[in-house]
Amino acid sequence: MKSGLSFSFVLKNLWARRLTTTLTVLGMALVVFVFACVLMMTEGLRQTMAGTGAYDNVVLIRKGSQTEVHSSVTREQARLVSILPGLATDSQGNSRAVAESLVLINLPRTGGEGNANVVVRGTSAAGIGMRPQIKLISGRMFEPGASEVIVGEGLTRGRLGIQLGDMLNFGARQWRVVGVFSADRSGFESELHADRDQIMQAFR
């Protein structure tokens, strides 16, 4: 009897203070929603970073640099690294060390909605081969010595919408999109890849 009266009293009290009750419930729901969003974002970042790296690949950057974009290594330094003992070799016994160049460019979004930052990776067939998650899904590889790029699948969607055959303007020249690649949802899918020497000439 007392339990029934207490429960009835609680219900009446909640109804009498329905505004406070509603705000409390909404506040708790908002906290749960934000917490769930943070967890989902953290998991997404973890999967992206895990897919981008590899246990048997080492990235060498300049002392004090935190990212590839902010690093600078000379050709001579890269050559010295390539002859260090203990590096993986191919079937001919040549070092599998690969020198790459990385630049950050601005590309216009569709509909005139400003620009987006995009990473351009100057690499080679050997560099692509060191990342087994990268697979060409349409078009072809860029030709060494040509102003050609292949584009990550992530850049073909959304507001950039880069498509096979498009002409991109950066580095004081035009570049033709000759291929589209996937990379198992890793960070590489948000990059453009081109011939390293051509990228270095365009941004020297």
Annotate each predicted stretch with a short phrase.
Residues 4-8, 23, 39, 43, ...:
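Alpha-helical membrane and juxtamembrane elements of multi-pass inner-membrane transport
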Residues 10, 45, 77, 195-198:
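Hydrophobic alpha-helical segments typical of transmembrane helices
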Residues 22, 67-68, 185:
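Short, small-residue-enriched loops and turns at beta-alpha junctions
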Residues 29, 33-119, 138-140, 145:
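Hydrophobic, regular-secondary-structure patches
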Residues 98-104, 116-126, 132-198:
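Hydrophobic secondary-structure segments that place a key small or acidic residue at a functional site
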Residues 199-204:
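Glycine- and charge-enriched low-complexity intrinsically disordered segments
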